[in-house]
Amino acid sequence: MPIRIPDQLPAAEVLREENIFVMQESRATTQAIRPLKVIILNLMPKKIETETQFLRLLSNSPLQVDVELLRIDNRTSKNTPTEHLDTFYRQFEGIKNRNFDGLIITGAPLGLVQFEDVIYWEHLQTIMTWAKDHVTSSLYVCWAAQAGLKLLYDLPKRTRKEKLSGVYKHTNLEQHHPILRGFDDQFLAPHSHYADFSADYLNAHTDLDILATSKEAGVYLASTKDKRNVFVTGHPEYDSLTLHNEYLRDLGEGMEPIIPVNYYPDDNPDIPPKATWRSHGHLLFSNWLNYCVYQQTPYDLDHFSELNFTRD
């Protein structure tokens, strides 16, 4: 089944060119089916690029997904046209009285900024708190995972001396967990962050299920027992060239970034990289939609209740 998005969203044409099944609102309204309601809080600067990446992963599921986009505030964006934001993005005030099947909170380039110094920190806390009573399952990606751990477990920010950048091998620790269903014993996924997600630290200070780890990157995937909060510390949504573009950006800003690990052939930035994590990303999002969202959410979202959720 397709994702359902606004008719004129730029991502629609990109995804159609990739032969991804996208259904416009005008067609979807004629179908007698209850689509999943998923809202994406997009914190990344290049919002069109990011929304396209996440929509691509959400599309590879037998479930019909009705996607809405949420912005954190109404400040002018340096990287996204105001017309695009005004046309396709909701303000929190306009959706706070509604319920959703799923919420995705993207990463943000704030790895070295303390939480209290993030200009929209209080607003983000409000949205995360709201989700407890209005969203079946929330997916926190990269920086958002760190922010979610702060809100839910009061964990302070832990930062590496050097940025973690590259494609790392991860080990599947819970083969029979629904989120990991169909995963290989080991799989690759990209990382691009300063945050330090130590398995020992999370085990000592939370009751999370640690689902997948990497020797170099630490915890990659974790979940609360009821699967209502899922944390992904890397970037399974990244395109094949996203790490490359970040590397060039940092070089252009006079920084001395490391060459992303296990990314370029022969570690040569002049040779185009290949995406080695694409199938993993699609399976992760399909499992989240099915086992964390669809299997737990009420048919009538007006009947949202904590009693709907299991801790299996």
UniProtKB/Swiss-Prot annotation:
Site (Important for acyl-CoA specificity): G111
Annotated substrate binding sites: K163, S192, R249
Catalytic activity, reaction form: L-homoserine + succinyl-CoA = O-succinyl-L-homoserine + CoA
InterPro entries: Class_I_gatase-like, HST_MetA, MetA_family
Matches recorded under CDD domains: GATase1_HTS
Residues at the site labelled Important for substrate specificity: S192
GO BP terms in the entry: L-methionine biosynthetic process from homoserine via O-succinyl-L-homoserine and cystathionine
Keywords: Acyltransferase, Amino-acid biosynthesis, Cytoplasm, Methionine biosynthesis, Transferase
Keyword Cytoplasm: yes
Pfam families xref list: HTS (PF04204)
SUPFAM superfamilies linked to this entry: Class I glutamine amidotransferase-like
GO cellular component: cytoplasm
Pathways per UniProt: Amino-acid biosynthesis; L-methionine biosynthesis via de novo pathway; O-succinyl-L-homoserine from L-homoserine: step 1/1
GO MF term list: homoserine O-acetyltransferase activity; homoserine O-succinyltransferase activity
E.C. number(s) listed in UniProt: 2.3.1.46
Keyword flag Transport: no
Active site (UniProt): C142, H235, E237
Subcellular location(s) per record: Cytoplasm
Known role: Transfers a succinyl group from succinyl-CoA to L-homoserine, forming succinyl-L-homoserine.
Protein family per UniProt: Belongs to the MetA family.
UniProt name for this protein: Homoserine O-succinyltransferase
